[in-house]
Each structure stands twice: as structure tokens, then as C-alpha cells.
């Protein structure tokens, strides 16, 4: 997994090229044999348009949302894609310019307005983007594409048509939610986002959306806040991209990447800024971990602390004999990793990409162990007595518990990211295997399987190919955890190859079973899901 491959041809730049949606689905060219039991659709979200008219988007998370679908039918694969008709997209296409500010791109006022109208537009309230480019997930019988604001977009998973925009602020107290909700077996949805808590201070709310009931009412109408976590700084909430969930507990990791509320409100309304302009790093905070009981909503007033890291993706969290095991894809340090994900950086030639990747926090897969019972223990002693981990938790004299992790994978500028597991059977439970994209200086150039118990790895990699997040699909008659396949969208810009393909791997050993090639480039996709037929 740590074997380094160079990319002097710069084929990875094709990940960040605009494309067009398809008028109609196309049949992919299959080599190999697709398992007969594999029936359903892989849905993926990502940016598909990196400029509007003469105006460029600047950040990886700015491009207009493109929804992809690979449908498996009787050994064939049908590919389709459509732009999501968000308000952001429709207005941009109508006005032929960037109309709503994105994560790293400020939308300038309409140049056709006079100077007085443009001045007033700064004070007419913040227009929040609904550009749903990050993920897609089910709620009841419906499917929603999402970003990380208060807006989610209902889509038709069969036709990829956009159905409607939903503002979650109309249902719960939330400023925005993550693109990584947890979905339980019965369809219950849990998510987290920041909110205004007591005394106008920021807090973090856990939102619960129940499964579809016999009355067939939209489950979102019944959404409610079930847990509230405190914020370490009153007016500076941390950036949160995911969280941990077990059958009995919710885990929230508060990282030192902060949103400065005053900067957010003043800069946006007075001189114009984007979301990235409002982040700042807290150099001395480290990381705070919070735990709450899932069923009662009780916040456990245990002060877990550790050294600084960036966190975007939880791998899995589970309970074991009075401990919570929390496995994370970490980036070591307090500086915001997203500072290095501007498109100009990602499109550089290979040597410059490598130089740039030397600067940000470096990646590491870590296991933290959080003790839940800390009564009658001695200060200064390690509270972790599980035989299979070297992670420690030490009670300090100030009543904080200092956590040191066990490192499950580490390689210089070699990340294991966009993790997936056999979620249906092992989400929130003890598990053995995780699947991820291998990032080589931020360039995705391999797919990896990690045994979190032995640290053994398996890798799929081909020259000049760039895969996406691996999605695990279990066999219907699976006995073992890794009985199934791994799906990934891969671009292949090399000569003599089709521009892109859907890769199907044996989840046991990461060997190729089949691929389904298409005749058009597929830009980078972030997250998605497999919808069974």
C-alpha cells in the first residue's frame, strides 16, 4: 500500500474537467463477468461543471452537482448522469455566471445592477448554496442529494430528475447538517450539525428522522433533535463532516478547525467572502471528544482530550466491555487540510503537486479508545485494558482523560481516505475490514483494503488510473464479513483506453472481477451508495 507511483503525465487533471450530462442512458462495455446476484444501482455525487460562462470555480467543493448512476441489469451495466437542478445551478445557467457563493468561490453581484443596487444586495441576507454535490442517501422511500448546508435535494433515483428542494431549518433547529448521516436497519436517520444553543452560544445538535410509518407521512416532518453537544468556543463552532454511532452511544469529535461567526457575518455582508475565508485554526485547542447516550439523549460529562488533528471521515465506532473504539482517518495537525484543495493546486504538474503536499497535516488511520466508566480510578494510570490495542486513555489531575491512539496505517503523504465498511452488518459493531481510496499527495491512485486487527493491506492499482470511493456490496448469502464486491468509478486518461470505467473487485483480495467502460470522461465523485433492485 505504501509503494509510491509517480504521475508525470498529469492524467489526474481529468478529474477536474467539466463535462456534459447525458441526454439518455448509455450501455457500458463489460469485460469480465459481473456476478449474477449483483442487481441494483450505484449512485454517485460530485462536481461536473467547474466554470460558468467566463467565471471559474476555485475550490474542489465548488463545482455544480452532477448525479451519476450505474445500473446493473442481467450482466449489463447502464450508465446515466444528470446535473441536479438546484436553485444554484438553474440560476447560474440562466444568468450565465456564478450567482450563489460556494465553498471557496465568492459570487459577485450582478454586474448589470447599478452601484446602489449592488451595495444593497450585500445587506439583503445570506444566500446559502444548495449545490448538492457531496453525497446521496435515503430517507424513508425517498432519496436526497446533499452538501453540508441546511438544504437537501430530493431526486428520482430511477430517472435522476430533480424533485424538490428541502430546507431542514423548517423542521429542526439546525444551521446545516453533514453529508454523512447514519442510516439504521429500520431506516432511522441520524445526523449532526451546529445550531444556536443556550444563551445564544453555538452547540451541536443530533437530529433524528424516524423511518417511514404506516401513515406514509414524510419522515422529515417528524424530525427532532435528540442530543445537544456543547461547543468549546461560544461563537466559533468546529467544522464537522461526520460522527460516530453505536447501538447505545453517539460520538462527536470536535476538531481545532473553527468557523469564525463574526468573520462569517461581517465579511460576507460587507466586503464579500466565501466559506473558506471564514475558517481559522485553533493552535492550542487540540481535539475534544464528546459522548452522549443515544436512547436517553444524556450528555456524558467526560472530558476526553488529545492532540490536534483534522478529521473528515469516521471509519467505524463500536462498544467493547465499557469502552468505545473509535477508528478515524486523521490528518495530523491543526491547519485546515481544505486549504490545499483549491483546483489550481490540484491541477498543477506532478512535481508541484508533490511539493505542495509536503506542507499540510499528514494522514494517518488511528484508533482511539474511550473509557466509559472512570469511577474509582487512579490519576495517571492507563484506563484501557483491552488486550488487542495499544491505544491509551490516562486520567489527569484536571479530570480530563488524555487519549493516545493506536496507528492502524501510516505512510508519508499516503492517505487511506473515503473509508467504507460492510456497514449493514458491522456499522457500529466490531469489525475487521475497511476499504478506502489511497491518496498519493492528494491524487487518488489506488484502492485499498485494511484489516484493522492485523494492519494487513491489499491493493488494487493500475498505471495512470484514478479511482473513487470504494463501495462495498455484500453477497445475498454472505457468511463472512468480506463476502461481496467493491465498486469504484475510475478514470483512465491514458492512450488506448476508454476515458472511464466502473470497476468491480472481489472484496476478499481486491482482485478484478469485471469492468464496465464508458466513452466519456467522468469527473471526480465524492460519495454515494448502492441501491439494491
Swiss-Prot record:
Where is a lipid covalently linked (S-palmitoyl cysteine)?
Answer: 112, 231, 329-330
Q: According to its UniProt record, how is this protein modified after translation? A: Palmitoylation by LRAT regulates ligand binding specificity; the palmitoylated form (membrane form) specifically binds all-trans-retinyl-palmitate, while the soluble unpalmitoylated form binds all-trans-retinol (vitamin A).
Q: How does it sit in the membrane?
A: Lipid-anchor
Which InterPro entries did the record assign? Carotenoid_Oase
- Per the record, residues carrying N-acetylthreonine are 2
User: What's a BP term from Gene Ontology annotated to this protein?
Assistant: retinoid metabolic process
Task: Name any cofactors this protein relies on.
Answer: Fe(2+)
What's the stated role of this polypeptide?
Critical isomerohydrolase in the retinoid cycle involved in regeneration of 11-cis-retinal, the chromophore of rod and cone opsins. Catalyzes the cleavage and isomerization of all-trans-retinyl fatty acid esters to 11-cis-retinol which is further oxidized by 11-cis retinol dehydrogenase to 11-cis-retinal for use as visual chromophore. Essential for the production of 11-cis retinal for both rod and cone photoreceptors. Also capable of catalyzing the isomerization of lutein to meso-zeaxanthin an eye-specific carotenoid.
The identity of this protein, by name, is Retinoid isomerohydrolase
Species of origin reads Ambystoma tigrinum (Eastern tiger salamander)
Taxon lineage: Eukaryota, Metazoa, Chordata, Craniata, Vertebrata
Q: Which gene encodes it?
A: RPE65
